[in-house]
Amino acid sequence: MMHTPSRFRVAVSPLSWTNDVLEDLGQDTPLEQCLSEAAAADFAGTELGRKFARKARVLKPILERHGLQLASGWHSGFLAERSVEAEMQAVAPHAELLQALGAKVMVYGECGVMVPEVPLDVPMSTRLRLTAADMAAYAGRLTRFARWLDKHYGLRLAYHHHLMMVAETLDEVCALFDQTGPEVGLLLDTGHAAAAGFDYRVLLERFGARIVHIHLKDVRAEVMRSVREQDLSFNEGVRRGMFTVPGDGSVDFGALAAFVRDTGYAGWLVVEAEQDPLKAPPLETVSRARRFIAA
């Protein structure tokens, strides 16, 4: 239980209904079901998913019909490989959509410097890493990009530390945030922290003032351990159920609950768990998570 006050805005990711990468998971689930069930489970917002319209004039009335706000949406960035100018051009349609729908943060996931073609289908041990020099240069580009994103779109960059990406481990996240400017906000993902082998509380202590978005994800420790021991891929881990919603796994959310209550955190809390909807019926699963957050 998190004992989270009702003043906090709680959203849910559409990944519980339809996976963005593993297209067979939730392929036949219509967007209408996702949004109606999200609203029925008492969520105030949602993040973007692959079945969402990408034109504000189309998406806005759909969300309004369900009483949902757009909390944010993932941008697949490549600043580890390309220039700030190239990233500016690539992000424009996405940033314009978020801005038009009133979002205040943009989720940034680094997709550069990954194994080509099928980066989430290779053994986790084959993940590519940045050298110290490359990390420093990357941090500089990320800071410039974040500054521009805020100036031109009023969006705070929420950097998503993530398995199989260049900021997966605690050392990598710390190295990056020690070298980026304050314009670069942190998306704290409790599940990705646990799956990467570190305690999310370290990020609360070191970078709490820079946390602008939170993903509430839990981990099934036994499944995660098996995935690591067998050196399986990220996607195979998802299929086997390494992630789940808060309250169903091994993550202790007590410190996070205290953080959002006591620090003035004003961002969204987003329930996010990549699962097979046939094994984890979405409405039942996210409703249980919503009760866990409120209890």
Give the ranges of each region predicted by the language model:
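Non-cysteine beta-strand/loop elements that form the S-adenosyl-L-methionine
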Residues: R9-P14, A71, V105-C111, A209-V227, ...
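Short, flexible, mixed-charge acidic loops at enzyme active sites
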Residues: L25-T29, V113-P123, M224-E236
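Acidic/histidine-rich catalytic cores of soluble enzymes
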Residues: T46, G140-S250
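Active-site acidic/histidine proton-transfer and metal-coordination neighborhood
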Residues: V84-L188
